[in-house]
Amino acid sequence: MTTMNERDLYYGQRLAEMIRCKTVSHKEGFEPEEFLKLRRVIGTLFPLVTEKAERTILGKDAYLYKLPGKDPSRNVLLMSHHDVVEAAGSWQEAPFAGVIRGGKLWGRGTVDTKTPLFAEFSALEELLLEGFEFPVNVYLFSSHNEEYSGDGALLAHDYFIEHSIRFDWISDEGGAVIAPPMPGIDKKCAMIAVHEKGRCTAQLIAGPQQGHAGLAGAHKTPVMRMAAFMTEVDEKKPFIRRLHPEVRGMFEALAPYMTFPMRTVFSNLGLFSGLLIRLMPKLNAAAGEMLGTGCTFKNISTDDDGTCRAQAFLRCINDADFAKDLDTLRKMAECHGVRIVLRDEDNEYYKPTSLDSRGYQYVKETAQAVFPYAAVAPFILPAGTDARRFTDLSDAVIRFAPIDIDDQQYASVHGENENISIDKLPIAVDFYKQLLRNYA
């Protein structure tokens, strides 16, 4: 491993062994063979971690490793799940063959998220080989059913609560080093998620109306009233929109790298916030989602008596705003004879990480050092991660995978032809090594 090319291939061949494990997770049942195969591969690839770490298996295949530190009262947590989604469609290379071609390793899980997991294990293994003493306890957690929000992370959370374990910081998947998220930036961006949108599933019910057919609105069927309600919500977009601290932080971090006139706008948020709130939803759906609650309607059906049922899947950023958004939604629904039913267990909200927290600042500084060619910025993640289960265990829950990917690789997550450039593997390992080596 004397040249970068040799190191690229070395890591690529080792990661390929993990990709060849078909660890597809299903709600319907657990098929252990490929998961046990991956466990054996990890044991072979990382013998020092296997020897020196305390390993606990949670549930059917979530695993938790602990390497003790010089200060036994402090802890940090690395995370990446090892389950993957099915690999349907037409692929250039078989999705579980682990083929290296054209400088890329092809296969399901190369981006989401066996590469980050491999980089975490590799960093631990290499630091142990160097004789490095970790300053604090280092935990590595990997769940087996993240892809369908299974119980792996919940079991880990219960374990940490039971053993009174809190963390200085937690690092999971989320952002990455990607192409600029908006026009006018001429360099790659290391996007670090410090918050992810909460999720709420509300039941919508439009029952048959009683009364004379000549009364106002009585001629509308439950389906018609449900459709009218959905249409009004979609057209009026009634939810609160604001520049949340995480979004302001993103704009402030990216503004120096923008071209004129975008730099002027994003460097003066006090003057232009109103304009941005109006324009962002027009840029793209993801930009609009960063401003507040998002709503998707689904699963519309009818009962034998004509009652129409549906669901509203709501994704919120701020819990106080969301409470007001729900009131607005209920009032709109009442006007159409639609009732909203919401149970406490159907509503999840996750505490954001402050941009001033020591943990975020440390991860940001590490990313700036390891990826000097990239602009480093926070953002709000619209998708879900295992990390959301742990926001009560740390003041700094960071969602960032140190993988440098292009647009095709980014789009391949849960799609066809997922792949990773093997020349980007060393820097991912180096990120975790620096994150652990310099922390005190």
PLM regions and their residue ranges:
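Acidic/His- and Gly-rich active-site-bordering loop/insert found
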Residues: 2-110, 127-134
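Flexible glycine/proline-enriched surface loops and loop-helix/loop-strand junctions
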Residues: 186-188, 207-213
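A short core secondary-structure module
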Residues: 154-155, 159, 213-238
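Short, solvent-exposed loop/turn segments at the edges of secondary structure
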Residues: 73, 93, 135, 166, ...
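An extended, acidic, His-containing surface patch that forms the Zn2+-binding/catalytic region
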Residues: 54-56, 71-73, 178-180, 187, ...
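Flexible glycine/proline-rich, aromatic-decorated loop/lid segments
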Residues: 174-175, 190-203, 400, 404-410
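Acidic/histidine-rich catalytic neighborhood of metal-dependent amide-processing enzymes
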Residues: 104-105, 111-191
